[in-house]
């Protein structure tokens, strides 16, 4: 297959998982290349996501790697053969690649879990709230780029607002709900949006109140996206250099434990809604 100039996060993940399977089998890249009848450069491109791999070749590699996890192999084959061109492709080359990667990961996710301690999670943001955030960025974005970023964020909400939503669970610190990003009216509308979404059967919203003693998780902002199998989960975090996609087994387990701890510290859903109602009355 021809080399890709800019592989997506899912394509890179496929290559990463094939490399991990090869390493677990104790094979060198040159040995894996021989199994497919390609050279070491082509094998390196496959394992870095720069080049694709057919389902037949993927299953041949998995068999030679003695991988007996059929669910994982099927999930990897689904990624390898996926030809979806979603709405996010309209923004490729216009917005940063991470925007398209996150939208694509959302689209394919089996579930999503957020922890928010600074800003309202993107999927819950109103248009006015999102616009205020993007307009405040430093360096400043031109007005047309702010508009594109807001539009992209609003379209991403389809995964919880659309006709085929995914299970969504979020834990939000009270500080997030109190910060007036765009004034009183906008803050009231934002809280109303959170309350409305929280009523859906597939959505669970929990709030960590200021009154909670011994909460040291102020740096816990994260997005956890469920893969077709747990091994293919992805955690998304903001990093100094941009958006970081975390996928090693050890890191994933770390963030699963972190989410459980933060969730346990939060109020149950109904008291969380009561607190949000109270905050609306204060505006």
Feature roles, as predicted:
Residues 2-16, 20, 24, 29-34, ...:
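Interdomain hinge/linker segments and adjacent boundary elements that couple functional modules
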Residues 171, 183-283:
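C-terminal regulatory/effector modules of DNA-binding transcriptional regulators
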């Amino acid at each position: 297959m021809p080399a890709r100039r800019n592989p997506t996060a899912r394509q890179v993940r496929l290559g990463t998982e094939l490399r991990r399977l090869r390493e677990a089998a104790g094979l060198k890249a040159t040995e894996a290349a021989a199994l497919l009848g390609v050279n070491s450069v082509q094998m390196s491109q496959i394992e870095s996501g720069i080049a694709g791999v057919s389902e037949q070749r993927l299953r041949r590699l998995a068999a030679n790697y003695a991988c007996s996890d059929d669910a994982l192999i099927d999930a990897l084959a689904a990624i390898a053969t996926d030809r979806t061109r979603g709405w996010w492709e309209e923004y490729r080359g216009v917005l940063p690649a991470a925007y398209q990667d996150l939208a694509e990961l959302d689209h394919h996710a089996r579930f999503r879990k957020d922890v928010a301690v600074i800003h309202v999670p993107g999927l819950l943001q109103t248009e006015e709230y999102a616009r205020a955030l993007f307009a405040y960025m430093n360096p400043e974005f031109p007005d047309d780029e702010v508009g594109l970023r807001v539009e992209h964020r609003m379209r991403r909400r389809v995964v919880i607002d659309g006709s085929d939503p995914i299970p969504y669970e979020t834990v939000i610190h009270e500080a997030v709900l109190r910060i007036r990003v765009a004034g009183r009216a906008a803050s009231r509308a934002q809280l109303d949006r959170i309350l409305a979404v929280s009523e859906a059967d597939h959505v669970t919203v929990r709030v960590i109140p200021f009154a909670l003693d011994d909460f040291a998780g102020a740096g816990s902002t994260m997005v956890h996206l469920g893969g077709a199998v747990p091994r293919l989960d992805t955690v998304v975090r903001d990093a100094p250099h941009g958006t970081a996609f975390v996928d090693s087994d050890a890191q994933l387990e770390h963030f699963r434990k972190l989410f459980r701890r933060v969730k346990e510290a939060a109020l149950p859903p109904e008291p969380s809604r009561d607190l949000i109602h109270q905050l609306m009355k204060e505006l």
